[in-house]
């Protein structure tokens, strides 16, 4: 009897030890950056947002801002990012850096002197950029970076494409580092931002982008595989000639990321411009939280216009904690708009329903001009239901151009006459945002053939819960 009791006690002890070992092994072999199996049942836009959310949850933001005088110092500074924390780094100027500072409100501001020499001896620029992006993941180069991702269970949600000869190139490094994406280079000439590509140029761009994504070695050809976004960070044309209707132009950011039959395999965002502004746009997308919103509706309540009403969208944004201001008919008018625009706006998110042309937009009972657009005190993400606003986004005398010049870091607008149905109704867009879909993806007609809505900004930027911050003392430079 005593022997049986001893045997039972021994068996219970052994089972307990094995269970403890099993739990310990689970902890050892758990991959902290892996997308949970349950998430893979979600639609691909939600999966993409959840991937970005994994990094927000696991890599805290250090409550500091680093200001640098030039690009070389920026690339040196970004190599201090790591898996224990990262922080905004901007090239100091008199316009965009102050806007970011005022909105971010850091506990610590660090100004770095210009580094000498500007680049390590015998190191090529592309290699420096790749190594700088890898350093944020405690890796030294592309090879060790991929090994680190495998170790952590991380699957990149997208690819960043830039040119080593483009002033926006350092923003590409930041987006690759922050979102855990491969960085690849595309050096050909594909036009200037206000241009229209002809059929030959467009086919060349499509092929070049697809080859660039293929070169990473990650699966990309279907939605909900790892690569579902492309971030182009360099100069190229905003639109291309429609193959079916030569007098119509389609949005390059909607035409890319598709198979020859038009089926989508990725959503595309685009950042271009000076090194100062492009880095600013990248840092806004990575680090800024969304707490306030302006919803301006100039549409009548009747007919199809009524489907684009803003009240339900406003209610949805309030449920995720945003402070929302709504202006709609009969209140929306030229007088009301000019009153609102008479002082700088502090809204993080701006959703607007309008009609018009590249240089004018309807605000209720009349047309406002580009000169009536408000200054921005804080950076903003903007969705503009309107025709032609993004036809020439590098021209500050157009609607999109002025919003971007004023400090918008993400912008959704049309390059041509798109018709109302090209845009997602605000309620549906907000429903997608609430579920975690990134901003640019939430605004897309995801099943339609290539059309006319351009998406400018980081395609992984989400309207998400505030990022956790840690004090600078926990992560010294």
Can you name each region flagged by the protein language model?
Residues 2-11:
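Bacterial N-terminal signal peptides that target proteins for export
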Residues 11-20:
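Bacterial N-terminal signal peptides
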Residues 28-64, 128-143:
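N-terminal low-complexity, Pro/Thr/Ser-rich intrinsically disordered segments
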Residues 66-67, 90, 109-112, 350-352:
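Short, hydrophobic beta-strand segments that form beta-sheet elements in well-ordered domains
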Residues 73-75, 81, 95-108, 116-477:
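Cysteine-dependent hydrolase recognition
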Residues 84-87:
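Short helix-loop boundary/capping segments at the starts of domains
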């Amino acid at each position: 009897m005593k022997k049986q009791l001893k045997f039972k006690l021994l068996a219970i002890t052994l089972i307990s030890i094995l269970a403890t070992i099993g739990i310990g092994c689970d902890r050892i072999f758990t991959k902290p950056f892996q997308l949970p199996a349950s998430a893979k049942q979600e639609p691909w836009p939600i999966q993409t947002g959840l991937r970005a959310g994994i990094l927000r949850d696991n890599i805290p933001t250090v409550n500091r801002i680093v200001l640098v005088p030039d690009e070389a110092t920026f690339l040196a500074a970004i190599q201090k990012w790591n898996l224990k924390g990262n922080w905004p780094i901007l090239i100091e100027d008199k316009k965009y850096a102050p806007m970011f500072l005022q909105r971010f409100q850091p506990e610590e501001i660090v100004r770095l002197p210009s580094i000498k020499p500007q680049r390590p001896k015998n190191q090529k620029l592309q290699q420096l950029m790749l190594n700088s992006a890898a350093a944020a993941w405690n890796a030294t180069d592309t090879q060790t970076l991929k090994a680190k991702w495998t170790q952590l269970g991380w699957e990149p949600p997208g690819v960043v494409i830039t040119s080593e000869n483009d002033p926006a190139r350092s923003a590409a490094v930041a987006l690759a580092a922050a979102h855990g994406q491969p960085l690849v280079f595309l050096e050909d000439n594909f036009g200037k931002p206000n241009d229209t590509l002809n059929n030959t140029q467009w086919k060349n761009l499509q092929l070049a982008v697809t080859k660039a994504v293929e070169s990473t070695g990650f699966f990309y050809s279907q939605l909900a595989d790892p690569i579902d976004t492309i971030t182009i960070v360099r100069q190229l044309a905003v639109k291309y000639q429609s193959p079916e209707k030569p007098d119509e132009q389609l949005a390059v950011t909607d035409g890319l990321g598709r198979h020859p039959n038009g089926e989508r395999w990725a959503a595309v965002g685009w950042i271009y411009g000076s090194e100062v502004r492009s880095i600013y746009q990248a840092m806004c997308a990575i680090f800024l939280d969304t707490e306030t919103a302006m919803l301006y509706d100039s549409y009548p309540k009747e007919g199809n216009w009524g489907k684009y009403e803003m009240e339900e969208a406003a209610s949805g944004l309030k449920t995720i904690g945003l402070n929302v201001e709504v202006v709609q008919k009969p209140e929306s008018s030229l007088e009301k708009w000019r009153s609102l625009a008479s002082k700088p706006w502090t809204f993080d998110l701006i959703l607007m329903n309008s009609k018009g042309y590249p240089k004018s937009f309807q605000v209720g009972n009349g047309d406002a001009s580009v000169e009536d657009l408000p200054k921005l005190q804080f950076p903003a993400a903007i969705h503009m239901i309107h025709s032609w606003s993004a036809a020439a986004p590098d021209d500050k005398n157009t609607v999109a151009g002025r919003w971007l010049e004023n400090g918008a870091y993400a912008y959704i607008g049309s390059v041509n006459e798109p018709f109302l149905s090209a845009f997602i109704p605000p309620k549906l867009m907000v429903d997608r945002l609430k579920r975690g879909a990134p901003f640019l993806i939430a605004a897309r007609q995801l099943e339609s053939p290539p059309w006319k809505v351009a998406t400018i900004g980081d395609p992984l930027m989400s309207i998400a819960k505030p990022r956790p911050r840690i004090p600078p003392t926990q992560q010294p430079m």
